[in-house]
Amino acid sequence: MITLYDLVLQDDRRPSPFCWRAKFALKHKGLAWRDEPMGFTEKQKIAFAQSQTVPVIHDGPTVVKDSWAIAQHLESAYPEKPLFGPARHHAHFVASWVDSAVQPALFPIVVSDLYDPK
């Protein structure tokens, strides 16, 4: 079974949009996975992946970090229910645009909600 290392807050909220992407890909493909929640200070949990950030997946002997690399791995290892179809390059463009334009604009909103939940 695939293990997904996911950022979790003390109140069990999952704030990482990068982990959300990995979960969306897993769900779309119909794959079962086990969440391995980790806090901001628990980086030792993903030391085996030589990564400081999530998401990281452990898929059998294969370790993959970064949401885009995870999507590519899942597409290759589990070709049923394709994620991208013939538009893989377009999907990568959109993901890069979201990372560079949309997420920075949303970050202050998300962070203020994390520190001042209503």
Predicted regions and their residues:
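GST-like domain detector, emphasizing the conserved glutathione-binding G-site
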Residues: 1-118
